[in-house]
Structure formats: C-alpha cells, structure tokens
Amino acid sequence: DRAGRIAAVGFSYRRLPAVAQLRDAVRDGAIGTPYFARAHFFSDYALDPSTPMAWRFDREASGGGTILDMATHTIDVLEHVLGDVREVLACTLDTTIARRPGEDGQTHEVTNDDTALISLRFAGGALASILSSRVGAGCPIELGLEVFGSAGHVRYAFNRPNEWILYQKDLGEPGADA
C-alpha cells in the first residue's frame, strides 16, 4: 500500500496433492506437536554472470530478488502446513553476482538479492529456517520441506512431486506415502 504497488503470487505449490496430504498429516497429529521446520528453494537461472541485466535483478523494477521471486513460495508452503507466521526472527540477503551485462554494452549493478536466509516463528510456536537462492549450481528448480515434531517428521521434495515421507518414532523406519 505505501509504495502504491500491488503484488500477487500464484501459490501453486500448496496445490500439489502430496503437499496437501503432508499438510493434512501434520494437522491431524501424525508427527505430534510441530517443533521446527527447514525448507529450501533453489534455482540456477541466475548462476551465469553473463546472464543479461533484466528486471529480475533490479530492486526498483522487481521489488526484491530471490526473497520475492522464490522464498515467498517456500513461506507459503510452510504457512499452508504450520499456520501463520507470527514473527520474523532474522533475514539475511546476499547478492552473489554484483554486476551483469546490459544491452548497452555496459555492466550494471544488481540491486537485489541472489540468496536469502530467513528464520521464522509460527503462531503454534514452531521455528523454521528457509534458504532460497537463484544461483544454486545444478538445481534448475528444487523445493524441499521438512517438518519435525514431538512424534516424528515429514519430508517433501519437488523433484519427486507425487511422494512425501512420514517418519513416526513409534514405528521406526521411514515410509513413503503418495
């Protein structure tokens, strides 16, 4: 509102059937009380320093780098599973590739982040750490999520979109559910 701009994101990852099943398992108590989570979203689309300067690398045009382009999706999946974020505990942003070539033959300063490291606390008390980067070598697109609780944990990886893993301490071995 203050900037006079509207931002909207199509949060498509929460609609994946495996993510919906994982969410239901957590909310139904399959892992007990959620204590903490870790999530990541990596891509390598900005890894090459010769990638031309574009709106994605300009804070004024984009509003932010990986934190708005990618981490928003990770935060949404975590909120979908754990409920609302109550507090941002820490956020560190880093620009790995500081300059990019422009169409004018000059190099231009990248004014937003390539990597974001975020710590959150959710309304239910669970903590989460998120690492998001658009310079993740060898990762065309990779989103992952783990939630640990008093009685087990769940795990999801986007590169296996129809699977998620549930480990329950009373049962021992991890098992996959689809």
What are these regions, as identified by a protein language model?
Residues 3-5, 126-127:
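A short helix->loop->beta-strand "cap" motif at the edges of active sites that frequently abuts
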Residues 76-168:
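Contiguous beta-strand/loop segments that form the cofactor/metal-binding neighborhood of enzyme cores
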Residues 174-178:
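Glycine-rich phosphate/pyrophosphate-binding loop
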Residues 5-8, 13-109:
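Predominantly a Rossmann-like dinucleotide-binding segment in NAD(P)-dependent oxidoreductases
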Residues 2, 157, 171-172:
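C-terminal helix-rich "cap/oligomerization" subdomain common to oxidoreductases
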Residues 48-51, 139, 173:
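Intrinsic-disorder/low-complexity coil detector
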